[in-house]
UniProtKB/Swiss-Prot annotation:
GO CC term, one of those recorded: cytoplasm
Name under which the protein is recorded: Ribosomal RNA large subunit methyltransferase H
Keyword list, A-Z: Cytoplasm, Methyltransferase, rRNA processing, S-adenosyl-L-methionine, Transferase
Catalytic activity: pseudouridine(1915) in 23S rRNA + S-adenosyl-L-methionine = N(3)-methylpseudouridine(1915) in 23S rRNA + S-adenosyl-L-homocysteine + H(+)
Location, primary (coarse class): cytoplasm
Function description: Specifically methylates the pseudouridine at position 1915 (m3Psi1915) in 23S rRNA.
Residues the record lists as binding S-adenosyl-L-methionine: L75, G106, F125, S126, E127, L128, T129, F130
Top-level EC class: transferase
Organism of provenance: Malacoplasma penetrans (strain HF-2) (Mycoplasma penetrans)
GO molecular function term, any single one: rRNA (pseudouridine-N3-)-methyltransferase activity
Amino acid sequence: MKIKIICFGKIKDKNITALINEYLSKINHFTNLTIVELSEEKINNENSIGEIEEALKKESKKLIPYLENSFNVLLDIKGVQMDSIKFANSINQNLIISKDINFYIGSSHGISESIKNKFNLKLSFSELTFNHQIFRLILLEQIYRAFSILNNTKYHK
């Protein structure tokens, strides 16, 4: 099984990058995880709803190639919430049926409504809004925690 995190933009903070690399190293003891960074569409007028919608449509087209032959999880504030054990079990279920898992983090404006029905699961970690760079780190920590639970290591208490 392979896991991909598909997201928009690059990490700019060296400290966050170091922590991300630390979690990638830990996770890759359990499974193959890669991060795919797509370019975020530029928006000249942040107040233009039409321009934002057009950018989201373009970004959605970049996601389509990743949606086939995988269990696709959209990280969405309106998604279902689950605890770490249920999250680990969800990952394990896909391990059993040998499906790759793709996690999607939208751009700063989210994900186009037109593509949201293509995902197998919409998952929310909180009703809070997170910085995209920090959220990537939070997702990696939860994936590592899930594999720690599945492998009975001391990390999860």
